[in-house]
């Protein structure tokens, strides 16, 4: 995708707080490579400016690509602002970088520059949870409680050990309320204590909760677990690691709209 007289702008949406350390050096390197290929590049860090610049550039039909320089949260933020035909590339600067790993993006920005210029594209489904856009997955229950505590306590870069105290707090305080789940496959609500909804088969630490989720079938993959306790959490974890959990009577899996 060599730059034309119109579509020659690349917007890099950089999250300065993503991951354990700053990845600004990689952003600068990619910028220099693209400018050498006659692209115009804008590096933006303000949420409001990122949104406005993306929308205005699309209206002017000059936007060649958006680069998400951050973690999965950065990608989730810019996704709703991109038209379906606007390509998005990733510089993985976050803690887990699930979507980048799934699509094969790495910190090798020379390869990323080649992908941007060659124009290789892949269309993906997206989901909505409480009105919020997501590409990877959404969860309800203990997992979501931990993540909420992490983000409420966040003051800067997130490292893996940033989850330690929120995890311990959730272990102490979480009471596993009953969840009611409705899907297009059932007239009655399912009842569970844990619920995971996947668009792509990725989860933290590579846990294969739904290893066959399809990113382009127009549906989402549900995995729910009926029992809630710390002991049962370890049992479910063992089952997931062995790939046996979906055969258990208290675990429900389905693909639904």
Model-found features: residue ranges?
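ATP/NTP phosphate-donor binding region
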Residues: 1-66, 76, 187
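Catalytic core of DAGKc-family lipid kinases
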Residues: 11, 36-37, 44-45, 84-87, ...
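Glycine-rich phosphate/pyrophosphate-binding beta-alpha loops
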Residues: 139, 143, 196-209
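Short conserved active-site loop signatures built around small residues
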Residues: 72, 195
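Gly/Ser/Thr-rich active-site loops/lids in small-molecule metabolic enzymes
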Residues: 154-162, 203-232
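Glycine-rich beta-strand-to-loop/alpha-helix junction loops that act as flexible
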Residues: 16, 69-71, 91-93
């Amino acid at each position: 995708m060599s730059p034309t007289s119109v579509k020659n702008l690349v917007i890099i949406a950089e999250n300065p707080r993503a991951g354990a350390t700053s990845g600004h050096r990689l952003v600068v390197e990619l910028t220099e490579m693209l400018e050498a290929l006659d692209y115009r590049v804008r590096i933006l860090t303000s949420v409001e400016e990122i949104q406005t610049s993306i929308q205005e550039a699309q209206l002017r039909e000059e936007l060649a690509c958006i680069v998400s320089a951050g973690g999965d949260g950065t990608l989730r933020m810019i996704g709703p602002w991109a038209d379906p035909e606007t390509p998005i590339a990733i510089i993985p600067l976050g803690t887990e970088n699930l979507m980048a790993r799934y699509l094969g993006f790495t910190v090798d920005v020379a390869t990323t520059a080649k992908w941007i210029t060659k124009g290789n594209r892949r269309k993906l489904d997206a989901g909505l949870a409480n009105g919020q856009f997501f590409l990877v997955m959404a969860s309800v229950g203990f997992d979501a409680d931990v993540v909420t505590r992490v983000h409420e306590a966040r003051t800067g870069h997130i490292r893996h050990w940033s989850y330690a105290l929120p995890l311990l707090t959730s272990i102490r305080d979480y009471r596993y309320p009953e969840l009611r789940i409705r899907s297009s496959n059932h007239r009655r609500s399912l009842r569970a204590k844990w619920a995971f909804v996947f668009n792509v088969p990725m989860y933290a630490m590579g846990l294969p909760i739904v290893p066959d989720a399809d990113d382009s079938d127009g549906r989402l993959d549900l995995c729910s677990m009926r029992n809630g306790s710390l002991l049962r959490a370890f049992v479910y974890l063992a089952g997931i690691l062995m790939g046996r959990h979906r055969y258990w009577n208290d675990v429900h899996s389905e693909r639904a709209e």
